[in-house]
Amino acid sequence: MSGAVPFGAGAVRTGAITGDEAIRARFGLGWPGFRLDVDLALPGRGVIALFGHSGSGKTTLLRCLAGLERAADGYLAVRGELWQDEAQRLFVPTHRRPLGYVFQEASLFAHLTVRRNLEFGLKRVPAASRRIPLDQAIALLGIEPLLDRMSGRLSGGERQRVAIARALATSPRLLLMDEPLAALDVKRKQEILPYLERLHAELDIPVVYVSHAPEEVARLADHVVLLADGRALAAGPIGEVMARLDLPFAHDEDAFVVIDARVAAHDEAYALTRLEFAGLPLWITGLDMPLASRVRARVLARDVSLALTERHDSSILNVLPARVVSLDEADPGRTLVRLDVAGTALLARITRRSAAQLGIVPGRDVYAQVKGVALLR
């Protein structure tokens, strides 16, 4: 990219993520009543969710990544290219960064057809730099039937799909999405989510996705940054962050964890499908999916009970060997238990009486009885 600088040594904290494929970001800026102060090392692939309440700094951080805000204390390296280093007075402006930006409201030209909107997005990208063919972007978002329609006559979901395709057509090295589903009703959201999942599965570019909706984060994200008051409270793989007892996720009434698994077998006689994760089975209502398909499941903390022995005289199909990692007893009547199941985090919410009777303490081996499993993708 013209204006990009090869990545070299930098002062930014890298944490556990290293190498030229990582995203390394440090920003410090503010105004009366708010200050953003983050120092992050993020993966260079997959969907990275910026999650937090309104005013937590999600969009400000996204704008810093885009170069729309210039932090006086700023450093940004994206997959081997240095985009900002204020210590060197280096700042690559937005129009010279190979990124795509999708806003809450699709910013299309209403007087142009969908095809013309897409072609407009290609104008600033030299032919030699086009790594994502326009036809591929069109196919990924399923918009071929819309190409000759006027953009002003599209539904909200259709407009967002076109906006995402236009962003992809610029062959970005980083795709930024600022609550792209926020303006859509439930039906339109459900229509567009499968297309976002396809981007995740088929494109090798990092996507930074802003959302305050836990269900979107659970379905799409690989990595989560939890923001509050302009600071990062936590950052890490979604399965780890969602299960941390010191974070708000785990204390929600609908607290859950996500489990990435594969389809291992179908039991047609009982209309069930056996998923497998970490070598363990997880039964779910029958799926019409090929064997070896990758899926993501959700398990609510309230749907997990504990036993000291493996029970075979119960209607519960999913009984998993586990070890107690930690407890939270902030609720006067209930105990939240974090479990380790063959390296996968699981949460169980049980009564304090049950925890006392069973002797639930860190290090105790137990059996997690999972009463319900929902498929996210």
Curated annotation (Swiss-Prot):
Coiled coil: none annotated. It is an enzyme of class 7 (translocase). The keyword Nucleotide-binding applies. Residues 313-377 form the Mop domain. SMART domains: AAA. It is a peripheral membrane protein. Keywords: ATP-binding, Cell inner membrane, Cell membrane, Membrane, Molybdenum, Nucleotide-binding, Translocase, Transport. ATP binds at residues 52-59. GO terms for molecular function: ABC-type molybdate transporter activity; ATP binding; ATP hydrolysis activity. Its EC number is 7.3.2.5. Residues 17-254 form the ABC transporter domain. Pfam families: ABC_tran, TOBE. It is found in: Cell inner membrane. The complex is composed of two ATP-binding proteins (ModC), two transmembrane proteins (ModB) and a solute-binding protein (ModA). Belongs to the ABC transporter superfamily. Molybdate importer (TC 3.A.1.8) family. This is Molybdenum import ATP-binding protein ModC.
